[in-house]
Amino acid sequence: MLRFVSAGESHGQALIAWVSGFPAGVPVDLEFIQRELHRRQLGYGRGARQRIEKDQPDIIAGVRHGHTIGAPIAVRIENRDWANWEKALPVEDTEGADDAQRPLTAPRPGHADLAGALKFNFHDARYVLERASARETASRVAAGALAKLLLREFAAEVLSHTIAVGHARLERDAAWEEIETVCKNLESPLRCVDGTAEAKMKAEVDHALRAGDSVGGVFEVIAHGIPPGLGSHAQWDEKLDARLARAVMSIQAVKAVELGSGVSNSSSYGSEVQDEIRYDAPSKRFARSSNRAGGLEGGITNGQDIVVRGYLKPISTLRRPLLSADMKTKEAVKAAYERSDVCVVPAGGVVGEAMVSLELAAAFLEKFGGDSLAETRRNFDGNQKQLDAF
């Protein structure tokens, strides 16, 4: 069973990504993992933290001579900002540590600060902030890059693009080739396939910046080349659409998830929603005239592109803070301010790619198994022959 967990705090020594259940023999491209981490740091509206961190992946277990070895994989990502926080967040209770602390007692509305402090009985939300921070997503992207490398062995690709920032929206569907092109362009400010729509999105970010505010939006993740038959209708927790929704919903600031055109489908008639089926003789596969289901029916992949959208609220930290209550004095105060971003939608899309890739890789290995890449490939090839003969 493929499993991913992470460890580390925003201003701690490092972040750790730990992946188990990965087959042996998968080629590991460090430059690709590095590029994925770099993509997460990009985007119009990101904050100063991105100029500090370099996010170099340091694989410390599970890979030898450029290939996975079937053991758990551990990736370490150094926090360069730790140098500025070492005295405030020491591991040991050293003399003078109290004087160096940077307490946070004015919880930010919308953040985990107060809920986490109540849960763990902290009267300082610093420890909650440190783990709840979206800095943690660097470990997700590192793990997701490994999942992408596995999926690529079977000609499957997962990418994302921005379809909305604030009130500005891409008012058309994007072709896969357009998404490929914009993802290759690391200079694209918001990773939107349409220049006119992107200019309007930038204006939304500029407005929020001038107002001391933040702005949310929507990213769309597309998984291309995924074979039919992943997931299952047989049990509620085996439905792949449910698993993908949970994976994307777990991303910081994501407050809603959509599969296919699920939102508009809810206000349409059945005859307008269902994707008609046809048989494509040259490819020996069943195909659809549309993809409103987003590549999933009954919790199972149907061979179409998988389409998942994540809806991001504006981040909680504001340069013009809202009202809060001090956790110690109980007095009305302005919420705390921490260095932050104005817009994280493009970065959210990269994290969305990672989470979708991890869930798809897990479902892929559940379907095809294999302790080594060679064994997984034999099983996959056998399934392809079965589909050809169907």
What are these language model-derived features?
Residues M1-F390:
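Generic N-terminal targeting/processing segments that precede catalytic cores or assembly contacts
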